[in-house]
Amino acid sequence: MNNNQQILLWALIIFIPFLAILWLIFKNGKTSSSYPYQQNSYETNSYPYQPILTAPIQLDTDLDSCNNQLASLRQQIQAEETKLRNKNTQLATCRSNVKKAIAQLNDAKARSGR
């Protein structure tokens, strides 16, 4: 292998990977970090910032949906709290009735002399 062939071989070893790296970076005319949208305007024939401009609308829709779900959950929680309050009231009434019955039983025992 003569000197010219060695120079050509080393040039190809360095130049081909360099071209491959450049092709990967700039394929389709963009870099992955340079553009926040998925496709260039010449690929879609649409305004390139459309996804960026419609994103707030989608976020508002998602936020409204989330707020509706939250309101529904709050209503369910309030309904469950009301049920628990009613059960607690029933339990307190039951305890009071049991205490009265025990007091009446103790009274009856005391009257009978046992």
From Swiss-Prot:
<dbReference type="GO" id="GO:0016020">
    <property type="term" value="C:membrane"/>
</dbReference>
<keyword id="KW-0472">Membrane</keyword>
<feature type="coiled-coil region">
    <location>
        <begin position="57"/>
        <end position="111"/>
    </location>
</feature>
<keyword id="KW-1133">Transmembrane helix</keyword>
<keyword id="KW-0812">Transmembrane</keyword>
<keyword id="KW-0175">Coiled coil</keyword>
<protein>
    <recommendedName>
        <fullName>Uncharacterized protein 138R</fullName>
    </recommendedName>
</protein>
<feature type="transmembrane region" description="Helical">
    <location>
        <begin position="6"/>
        <end position="26"/>
    </location>
</feature>
